[in-house]
Amino acid sequence: MEDFVRQCFNPMIVELAEKAMKEYGEDPRIETNKFAAICTHMEVSFMYSDFHFINERGESIIVESGDPNALLKHRFEIIEGRDRAMAWTVVNSICNTTGVGKPKFLPDLYDYKEDRFIEIGVTRREVHIYYLEKANKIKSEETHIHIFSFTGEEMATKADYTLDEESRARIKTRLFTIRQEMASRGLWDSFRQSERGEETIEERFEITGTMRRLADQSLPPNFSSLENFRAYVDGFEPNGYIEGKLSQMSKEVNARIEPFLKTTPRPLRLPGGPPCFQRSKFLLMDALKLSIEDPSHEGEGIPLYDAIKCMKTFFGWKEPIIVKPHEKGINSNYLLAWKQVLAEIQDIESEKKVPRTKNIKKTSQLKWALGENMAPEKVDFDDCKDVSDLKQYDSDEPEFRSLASWIQSEFNKACELTDSSWIELDEIGEDVAPIEHIASMRRNYFTAEVSHCRATEYIMKGVYINTALLNASCAAMDDFQLIPMISKCRTKEGRRKTNLYGFIIKGRSHLRNDTDVVNFVSMEFSLTDPRLEPHKWEKYCVLEIGDMLLRTSIGQVSRPMFLYVRTNGTSKIKMKWGMEMRRCLLQSLQQIESMIEAESSVKEKDMTKEFFENKSETWPIGESPKGVEEGSIGKVCRTLLAKSVFNSLYASPQLEGFSAESRKLLLIVQALRDNLEPGTFDLGGLYESIEECLINDPWVLLNASWFNSFLTHALR
């Protein structure tokens, strides 16, 4: 049969039919009768449209050959043979321009003269049986049905055959010829008997063997077979049934299922108030590094030694001054704390042997900054349960904050490439089985795309800081330990480089439970002037500590160097997750893999190489107010990685809630885009549960703003 199809039909039709079958995971070499049926249906649809035009007076005419310059418009728009996404785009466009109602299923043609969609049917059975099945499935007055059989019979809605006698005769003759050709090769009987009831290629494929047994075993109670259950589901009318079930539950429960239309959803309401502030545990785009290349000093690799070496590369230190005070803090204490760190580093250098770790003096400024002796005294409950007015202390409601532009800039920066490589090839793990050859190839391609990404720098910085802080918290519980913030990378030329971002001073850390908090003071170098976006730096006291000479296209320029100081806190569980930030690489790699898999299953071969090496192809990255943003595959990799990294850096209950609840609304919108006619109840309640997570978190507010852009463009 496969040979017959390839000989009998136009190669373009054969190619389209193969593509359609592969899109739904069916093999033309195995499902040969279905292959023949799809080719036949396509050919009839194309013949239906051939030679039919509308002239400038709006009259329908037949032109088999003639003046190529005549102002003629095709009478029929062909929808059959296009891939699903494009076909729905064409249907939507027709509906928008003509005002015709949108069909539930993809039709085959649109008739511009009669202003209606047409569903073509080709059957090996009785035409009236097939017609009833089609009509029952489509359930639409809008779509005109026209059925042809291989015996020369036809049937159409209201006996309106649309085309002239001669055009229809041409189709019937072609069908009769196909039947004769099949019969002469002994293929007709098998082809005729293989037609089952009305179905679309995506709705039915045979389940056999183990999968069939599993399907029969996993049916809900009271169903004897899979067919039985399918028939029930196909005829299921959700509205009344679900309402009936709800009415049995309680008199208070009342849910009316409302259709979810393009006009139904509204944008999420973002909170007002002062702009949101930076709340990450370390600086991101504003960080400045003091670096040494090809480190080979004594004690190289010991953080304190590396930090001292990096500090010595800078010569522009000056008397520190406060340029942006912290609103609520004692700013002079932050200034004194930095002076103390500088003094203690100089003390270390004067010692004969530099120690591996440095515990610094518990001065009054550090005790204040680290909250020493500030925790309320704990009293055993048994000692105070008789106190009459015992109550939990009042906590303030969180203050609402509005979205600020800096968080979008932070995200854009995280997606960019740096001039250093932050991970080696083996950061994601090694092969353990031969099947993983493709996995290795994907991993290597992916690593090449993201190794220089700024988000990858944030991963390595986060892993280092959290590991060092957790180690110090366990090893020196009572001490105020000085912890350098360090990262390592390779330059373009492959030279090793050690970077110092600043210092952390750890407070007392008797961490018994996962959620017990250790306080720390962070002091980070930066060239960003805090007075440009003071709202971003609400939690910081910023000092000016030096002047840095920078090489620019116009020569050397001097820029002030700042130190961003703040009190912060973390816990064992947060540090544990911070140490595992490399998981972000794995998560984004898996997302890319699922894109490759989708492409590979359509093409029936592994598309990894083409996917990464076809530099001309662009992919959707996300929604912005301008519409769908597209970029290279590298940009997609880096954007997915940056999202994963920001989910880790800005992890919070607000993010958890927003992600879980907004996903429900997203799925409903996707269902609407896929023409699945979703219904909802208590949509207001869903909006409430999403919007109660929009309080003050910058990353959540940015995601909500992206979600609104998506809603705008998805429902156009």
Swiss-Prot record:
Compartments (UniProt record): Host cytoplasm; Host nucleus
Motif annotated as Nuclear localization signal 1 (NLS1), chain positions: 124-139
MF-aspect GO terms: endonuclease activity; metal ion binding; RNA binding
Keyword vocabulary terms for this entry: Cap snatching, Endonuclease, Eukaryotic host gene expression shutoff by virus, Eukaryotic host transcription shutoff by virus, Host cytoplasm, Host gene expression shutoff by virus, Host nucleus, Host-virus interaction, Hydrolase, Inhibition of host RNA polymerase II by virus, Manganese, Metal-binding, Nuclease, Phosphoprotein
Classification via InterPro entries: INFV_PA (IPR037534), PA/PA-X (IPR001009), PA/PA-X_sf (IPR038372)
Cofactor: Mn(2+)
Pfam families named among the record's database cross-references: Flu_PA (PF00603)
Residues holding Mn(2+) 1: H41, D108, E119, I120
Enzyme Commission (EC) number: 3.1.-.-
Function: Plays an essential role in viral RNA transcription and replication by forming the heterotrimeric polymerase complex together with PB1 and PB2 subunits. The complex transcribes viral mRNAs by using a unique mechanism called cap-snatching. It consists in the hijacking and cleavage of host capped pre-mRNAs. These short capped RNAs are then used as primers for viral mRNAs. The PB2 subunit is responsible for the binding of the 5' cap of cellular pre-mRNAs which are subsequently cleaved after 10-13 nucleotides by the PA subunit that carries the endonuclease activity.
Similarity comment text for this entry: Belongs to the influenza viruses PA family.
Protein name per the record: Polymerase acidic protein
